Curated annotation (Swiss-Prot):
Protein name, entry field: Mitochondrial substrate carrier family protein X
Topological type in the membrane: Multi-pass membrane protein
Record's subcellular location: Mitochondrion inner membrane
Residue ranges, Mitochondrial matrix side: 45-75, 144-173, 229-271
Amino acid sequence: MVQQQQQQQQIKKNQVKPPLYSNLIAGAIAGVIGSSVVFPLDFVKTRLQQQRVSIDGSKQYNGIIDCFKKVIKNEGGVRGLYRGLSSNLIGIIPEKALKLAMNDYFRTRFQGDRSYIKLWEEVASGGLAGMCQVVATNPMELVKIRMQVSGLSGKKASLKEVVSELGIKGLYKGTASTLLRDVPFSMIYFSIYGRMKHNLTDQETGEIGLPKILLCGITAGSIAASVSTPFDVIKTRIQVKPGPNDPHYKGIADCFRKTIQSEGPKALFKGVLPRVCIISPLFGITLVVYEIQKSFYASTH
């Protein structure tokens, strides 16, 4: 009898849906924690995606470890791996807040009074959440990339310098390519995460442990990150300030064409390993923190 009452209380708790403002706050906090942990890998990923093969066939970085070593040695130690973190965190707050909260919002709207949500509704919710996030966060994503790459030329650009150089209009350079990356990513990620979470949840109590949430986040992140890597490469190249010997791109299609012509199709998957290594723990940690906060809200209301 007591056990049944506890189960019913747990079910009622899990049915409590936090309001949008609460999910926005939870998403922001979760994003800051997750992003700070994996930022050095994001830095290395950007460097690897941007580097070109020289005329003699040599590369500045021979993989992830080599990039870590050279940045630490030549660019101010470990601190060099955190260049762009300030602008990244400024962008992460609205990015994760909007992406996570709006995904839950659209899921709730699609689901209505039903006890389940259809797969296409999960896919659509993720895509719409991705669109909302990109419009708000593209400027900070662009600034972060410019700051991460600036050390290559010897001069390290500051946040103020990058923003002054780009101007308001320039801060939205590459928005189309960012949408091309983030909308499919969100569609894949949230649909896989939602399905896995549902299948691993105890159907009697509605409970799911944090390790299982972490597993869902890591698995969904790995798949979504791998599939969307070509779009991430194109976005990075469009948004990075070109050097004297770098090609100039007229748009997404032109960047695809020139990249494949000069470096082959493999170039579209540059940085795929660090990208997966970033996205997997980032979204795993972020979703765990996010779900903890949602659970806390439910237990106090």
